[in-house]
């Protein structure tokens, strides 16, 4: 069974965790931005009837 030779440092662990968190934040911000543009009718990435509001 493969075993790591040395322990991962706390700073490296923190950096990796922050990268993982920032990816989630970016995805959430993008989703929120898209929802905002859909609700105002300014979306350029969706085709279809613009008068149909949910």
Swiss-Prot record:
Pfam families tied to this protein: Ribosomal_L32p
Descriptive protein name: Large ribosomal subunit protein bL32c
InterPro entries, per database record: Ribosomal_bL32, Ribosomal_bL32_plant/cyanobact, Ribosomal_zn-bd
UniProt organism field: Cucumis sativus (Cucumber)
Gene that this sequence comes from: rpl32
HAMAP family linked to this entry: Ribosomal_bL32
Keyword tags: Chloroplast, Plastid, Ribonucleoprotein, Ribosomal protein
Family: Belongs to the bacterial ribosomal protein bL32 family.
Gene Ontology annotations of biological process type: translation
Main subcellular location of this protein, as a coarse class: plastid
GO molecular function annotation: structural constituent of ribosome
């Amino acid at each position: 069974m493969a075993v790591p030779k040395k322990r991962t440092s706390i700073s490296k662990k923190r950096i990796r965790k922050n990268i993982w968190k920032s990816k989630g934040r970016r995805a959430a911000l993008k989703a929120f931005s898209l929802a905002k543009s859909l609700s105002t009718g300014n979306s350029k990435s969706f085709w279809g009837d613009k008068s149909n509001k949910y």
